[in-house]
């Protein structure tokens, strides 16, 4: 069974969207394997976003993601990575279609509500970072 990581970002937590987002995943057949509310450390975020280091949005992204609690979850199911990516919608808010999580709730590309692993390999790496007890 495939697993993936999804994170409701600080703006989604502050706006009370955890239940709505989780419901969308569960309605598509995904199961919640693990979850926690956490205010991520700079160290955790630097490891998570290491491939973005040096890009202009890197520091603001780290600041934003460490600004408050997030809801990190491991979801399990057939094609979990692909399903989460499709439900999340495009990263850029102007490209996110209505009916997707970002299309319905994102305010900007920076405050885009949700993270989802972009591949099976990324999911394994990210789950090990956020949920070392599952590794």
UniProtKB/Swiss-Prot annotation:
<dbReference type="InterPro" id="IPR036850">
    <property type="entry name" value="NDK-like_dom_sf"/>
</dbReference>
<dbReference type="InterPro" id="IPR023005">
    <property type="entry name" value="Nucleoside_diP_kinase_AS"/>
</dbReference>
<feature type="binding site">
    <location>
        <position position="85"/>
    </location>
    <ligand>
        <name>ATP</name>
    </ligand>
</feature>
<feature type="binding site">
    <location>
        <position position="57"/>
    </location>
    <ligand>
        <name>ATP</name>
    </ligand>
</feature>
<feature type="binding site">
    <location>
        <position position="102"/>
    </location>
    <ligand>
        <name>ATP</name>
    </ligand>
</feature>
<feature type="binding site">
    <location>
        <position position="112"/>
    </location>
    <ligand>
        <name>ATP</name>
    </ligand>
</feature>
<keyword id="KW-0418">Kinase</keyword>
<keyword id="KW-0547">Nucleotide-binding</keyword>
<dbReference type="GO" id="GO:0005737">
    <property type="term" value="C:cytoplasm"/>
</dbReference>
<keyword id="KW-0067">ATP-binding</keyword>
<keyword id="KW-0808">Transferase</keyword>
<keyword id="KW-0597">Phosphoprotein</keyword>
<dbReference type="GO" id="GO:0006228">
    <property type="term" value="P:UTP biosynthetic process"/>
</dbReference>
<feature type="binding site">
    <location>
        <position position="91"/>
    </location>
    <ligand>
        <name>ATP</name>
    </ligand>
</feature>
<dbReference type="GO" id="GO:0004550">
    <property type="term" value="F:nucleoside diphosphate kinase activity"/>
</dbReference>
<feature type="binding site">
    <location>
        <position position="9"/>
    </location>
    <ligand>
        <name>ATP</name>
    </ligand>
</feature>
<comment type="function">
    <text>Major role in the synthesis of nucleoside triphosphates other than ATP. The ATP gamma phosphate is transferred to the NDP beta phosphate via a ping-pong mechanism, using a phosphorylated active-site intermediate.</text>
</comment>
<dbReference type="InterPro" id="IPR034907">
    <property type="entry name" value="NDK-like_dom"/>
</dbReference>
<dbReference type="Pfam" id="PF00334">
    <property type="entry name" value="NDK"/>
</dbReference>
<keyword id="KW-0479">Metal-binding</keyword>
<dbReference type="GO" id="GO:0005524">
    <property type="term" value="F:ATP binding"/>
</dbReference>
<dbReference type="GO" id="GO:0046872">
    <property type="term" value="F:metal ion binding"/>
</dbReference>
<dbReference type="InterPro" id="IPR001564">
    <property type="entry name" value="Nucleoside_diP_kinase"/>
</dbReference>
<feature type="active site" description="Pros-phosphohistidine intermediate">
    <location>
        <position position="115"/>
    </location>
</feature>
<dbReference type="GO" id="GO:0006183">
    <property type="term" value="P:GTP biosynthetic process"/>
</dbReference>
<keyword id="KW-0546">Nucleotide metabolism</keyword>
<comment type="similarity">
    <text>Belongs to the NDK family.</text>
</comment>
<comment type="subunit">
    <text>Homotetramer.</text>
</comment>
<dbReference type="GO" id="GO:0006241">
    <property type="term" value="P:CTP biosynthetic process"/>
</dbReference>
<keyword id="KW-0460">Magnesium</keyword>
<protein>
    <recommendedName>
        <fullName>Nucleoside diphosphate kinase</fullName>
        <ecNumber>2.7.4.6</ecNumber>
    </recommendedName>
</protein>
<keyword id="KW-0963">Cytoplasm</keyword>
